[in-house]
């Protein structure tokens, strides 16, 4: 069984969100008597070379993808070759293959509702909000839905693009501050973005949460030790790893498989 990650081009470190999921996958494969081969691949147009090792595996678990519009042809290629694979990521109706993912829209909605319940009314969103990054986009749509229900808009000036790194979060928050548009809360599309934003706000002399509340998404270990500890949306990495392995093994056995969406959970800490 080959596990395979495609990190974003400018992120040389493994996203800590995937480390806990990797532990769950490792335990689940061991229980089933499978060996786990981990391969790190960069996005390229050479599909033959990229997937050469997959022929030696019973199946593939895919983690990470960067720009989905560039990544999707890889999935089409796997389907065409008859490879058994399951992917962690956005669950889309027209997507090739089988996917396991979190309920990103509901998670974005829940954390935004929490901020609104605290009296926040000018909520910014840090993270890409396009189909190129569908998980972030779903989180944005949940944020947008909560604002619309509260009869508040989601002005474009309060959305700043960012990939899932601390440095991107720092830059996005600095950009937000420089725009001069009032905001009293930040919904970050990932914890790494949120942690970078915390650093940028502190660097700008803005107190969290007295002046601005900050919330993330993922509940990585660093979220609880951030300063202040980060309110976030927990993705169930233990269940995710189990479902990825279970689904792939059913596929290998020739049994029918379907996409699965895993519920998220709001985790309230001191940042919001």
Language model segments and positions:
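Hinge/beta->alpha junction and helix N-cap segments in small-molecule ligand-binding domains
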Residues: 7-19, 38-47, 66, 100-110, ...
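Alpha-helical recognition/docking segments in bacterial nutrient-uptake
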Residues: 1-113, 178, 192
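Periplasmic-binding protein-like
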Residues: 1, 58-65, 124-126, 159, ...
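Glycine-rich phosphate/diphosphate-binding loops that line cofactor/substrate pockets in enzymes
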Residues: 112-123
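Residue-level detector of anion-binding/catalytic polar loops
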Residues: 34-35, 84, 121, 153, ...
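Flexible loop/turn connectors
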Residues: 170, 174-272
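Alpha-helical structural signal in soluble globular domains
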Residues: 24-28, 77, 138-150, 196-204
């Amino acid at each position: 069984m080959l596990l395979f990650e495609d990190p974003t081009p400018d992120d040389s470190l493994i996203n800590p969100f995937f480390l806990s999921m990797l532990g769950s996958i490792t335990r689940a494969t061991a229980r089933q008597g499978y060996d786990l081969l981990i391969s790190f691949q960069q996005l390229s147009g050479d599909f033959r070379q990229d997937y050469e090792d997959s022929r030696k595996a019973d199946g593939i678990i895919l983690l990470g993808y960067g720009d989905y519009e560039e990544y999707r042809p890889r999935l089409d290629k796997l389907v065409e070759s008859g490879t058994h694979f399951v992917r962690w990521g956005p669950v889309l109706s027209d997507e090739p293959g089988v996917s396991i993912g979190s309920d990103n829209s509901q998670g974005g909605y829940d954390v935004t509702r929490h901020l609104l319940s605290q009296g926040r009314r000018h909520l910014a969103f840090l993270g890409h909000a396009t189909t190129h990054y569908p998980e972030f986009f779903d989180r944005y749509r949940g944020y947008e839905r909560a604002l619309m229900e509260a009869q508040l808009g989601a002005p474009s000036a309060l959305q700043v693009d960012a990939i899932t790194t601390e440095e991107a979060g720092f830059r996005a928050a600095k950009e937000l501050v420089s725009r001069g548009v009032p905001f009293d809360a930040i919904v970050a599309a990932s914890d790494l973005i949120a942690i970078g934003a915390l650093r940028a706000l502190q660097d700008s002399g803005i107190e969290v949460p007295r002046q601005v509340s900050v919330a993330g998404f993922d509940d990585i270990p660093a979220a609880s030790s951030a300063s202040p500890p980060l309110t976030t949306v927990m993705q169930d990495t233990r269940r995710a790893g189990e479902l990825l392995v279970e689904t792939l093994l059913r596929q290998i056995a020739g049994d029918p498989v379907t996409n699965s969406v895993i519920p998220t959970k709001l985790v309230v800490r001191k940042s919001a």
